[in-house]
Amino acid sequence: MLAMLLCTSLAMAQSKFNVKGIIIDKETDEALIAASVQLTKEDGTYVTGKATDMNGAFEMKNVKKDKYKLKITYVGYQPKELDLDLTTQKEKNVDMGYLTMSTDAVMLEAATVTAQASKVQVKGDSLVFNADAYRLPPGSALEELIKRLPGATIEEDGTVKINGKAVSKILVDGKEYFINDKNVALKNLPTNIIDNVKAYDRKSDLARVTGIDDGEDETVLDLTVKKGMMNGWMGQLNGGMGTEKRYNTRANINRFTDSESYSLVASANNIGDRGFGGGGGRGWGRWNGNGLRASKELGFNFATETDKLETGGYIWHRYDGNDSWSQSSSQNFVNKIGAFSQSVNQSYSSNASLSAGFRLEWKPDSMWNIIFRPNASYSRNRGYSYGNSGTYDSDPAEYDEKKLDEAEQAFGDRAEVSDSEIDDIIETIVNTRNSRQQTYSNNKGMNGELQINRKLNNEGRNITLRMTGGFTNSESTQLSASSINYRASTGMDNDINNRYYDTPSRSRNYSIQATYSEPIAKRTYLQFSYRFNYRYNKSDRGAYTYDDLTYSDLVNALKTHRYDVAGAVDELMSLGHEQLYDNSLSQFSEYQNFDHTAGIMLRIVRDKYNLSAGVEILPQHSVLNYKYMGKEYNDITRNVVNFTPTLNLRYKFNDMTNLQVRYNGRTSQPSMTNLLEITDDSDPLNIRMGNSKLKPSFSQNLRAFFNTYDAEHQRSLFSHAYFQLTQNSISNRTYYDESTGVSTTKPENINGNWSGGLGLGMSTAIDKEKYFTIDEFTNFGYTNSVGYLDPVKFPDNDKSTTKGLSLNQSLSFTYRKDWLEASLNGDMTYTHQTNNVLDNNTFNYWDFSYGAELNIMAPWGTTLNSDISMNSRRGYSQASMNTNELIWNVMISHSFFKDRSLTVSLEWNDILKEQSNISRTINAFQRSDSRSNTIYSYGMVRVIYKLNIFGGKFGASGGNQGGFGNFGGWGGGRPGGGGGGRPGGRR
């Protein structure tokens, strides 16, 4: 009986099989990630199914002996069906090898989408975003795609962050694109050519060559160009005219191959470089910045690669003009109530720049590596601004704005008023200031870097020599007029300051570094390095005053010669107004820094983890010659020692799950001018003092990142956490004169500044067919900010402490199938902050939005893109800032010709004209609310022409922009995740 049971058990065990294989593109051999593999019986009954992993592989375990159909589907590819007969199979493991799939050439006419492309995946240390999973308006640039990526943010200053990491460069197929200017790619690269976007930490040149992590990683976005668009020329012409005299033109032509790339880009617009929508429906997007901006750009970029030589370079010209208005109100924490201030400013600027860079990497043989990076730049900047401000005993937000303006005018004129309400406002005014100025500057510089590496064996022993050098010359001038009015009760006369500054400055630097790496055990290395760095800076500011000029006289000259400092000065001289040299306001400084850096680094490389740890010691010798405020200091020297510990751990759980932990510390010295006992009263309302007793500060940063991906469910999880602590940070102790509103600050060391936070993101499909997806991102942050107070006013506790808690939650629910994409989304930011100084010491404010987005793509070439959101604010100081704004954006477009190469669109941003630009900041010293002008509502007609001349069979494409070209089409397109090519060679 036992033998019979054993035989039966063995027979049943051998009647089950494990079926595996790898799905690849027939033409490119590229792995197809998240392809759907289903096993059915011959009558169609479903048995089991899998999605391929990052290598295109699948495995089905414990399949019973029978005859089956193996069905494979993938977006943009022809379905594949194979017969699988296990009744005659003897081996338990059935390897079907490489199964190829062909792209669907008639997908435009009769596409039946059977799977949806995953939005984001994890591959090793990289987050890989599938561009075809995001439906974008026709003609969209890269920035429009980045805005929609889970965990990605574009901040007000243009900084791009992915999962909390700031992006420093953008690459195209692994090659640097305009080297140091990521905005060129964001504003100009068309999204229809992009297959996927990979975010990862790229090693420095030194680390990549030596294999030893030096801790100088930079987060990059690496764009993979669609294979069908390689080996040919492609371009896009995009022109638009709109209401409010708005225009937007953009042109680019590109060639990308496996070994070279060329790009020519040009643009001109006055819409602030914004794309369609401007953030409507997706929370508080202020990426179009402050002010009414116009820009013009022209640039060329190239990169080439052979077995031994890589070259790349760019030349770039840009012009920017900006008309910026802002209003701010603040509460300074100087007493129990706070000192209140309000200001209005208007500025105009005109900036032009020209830059060029080059990169060469030469590998004469397997043992040598030489990298050379020179670059040069020139810029010219002109500015003109004017504004007024006031300081108050109570919050001016409580008063009518018109009467507040009248009260400030009467206060400045010291005039009698009959309106009791205006008289009450005047009683609260401490001082007012009116100012106007114009500036001019030009800057030119050049620098270069040469790195030479020699491997001494193939086990990790090598030596590296690295040299850098550069210089910068600049010239700036400023002509300004300022009038300050004080309370009559102070007995102080109004302060009139008419000044001219002429400031030439020079700087130069060079460094030399030697690095030696030694293997001390199997896959364990020790690196020694030494670097000498010399820096020289010289600035000689000449200050001149016009004592015989009234404030209004100089203002009139500034108005007449806007943007022309030299013209205004010449007019004043022709009218007999003499410049008087002011020795106390003139400033001369000459720095010399001699830095030595010695470091040691240990790196351990294992299959599951990489660990590097090290420390650098930085002795520094500085010499300063300084003259200011009538005092002169010659050959002031300082000798200090800084140190920087680092730790970096990367742990790989599997191909789709990884953890990274990074720690670094850094010693920072106070500036030598802060150490000088000088009282700077050049600004009568803000007096600054020096402090010779300042100590160095030490900052510690700990960051952790975790990513994982489930291919079967298209589920990505990504998270980050951070903690920052600064010991002996330099803070300003503020002494505030309540009668005049004059603040006197003195730098002092303080402890207690720290912050921490946690971010968690998820993108997942929630149904079997992957039509429904949820994207979620949560950010939590806490800050503890401290500063010193006037000990006379606060004898018991002279520290101001502001504690802040912030929570941000964004959620998006999307349905995506064939010709339709619809989403519901929301975004909420809650901030709770307390301060120990004020009587009313709690601040709670909310920014939240909720809305919907709709994208319809008809098969005849018409697309509709629309989003609507309700954006709300609560808890701001002024009632006019606590708003509900219904933002609605819409675009309708139609593509012409068989290849959809010509598209005409009509778009309207902020149809209801309700958008505004408001922000709040709080720290240990103040709470500040501000609003500014920017580009809001306008309509525009665009014409977009896509020129694609390929070496292959593909023509013009619509890609992820909702068109119906050979890439993307109705449901996305070629393999998401790119770079996931099959391992090894074809068997």
What are these regions (language model features)?
Residues 33, 59-67, 75:
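Short Pro-Gly-centered beta-turn/loop motif in secreted/extracellular proteins
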Residues 180, 203-245, 259-987:
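Primarily recognizes Gram-negative and organellar outer-membrane beta-barrels
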Residues 42-57:
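Short, acidic Ser/Thr/Gly-rich low-complexity loop/linker segments typical of extracellular
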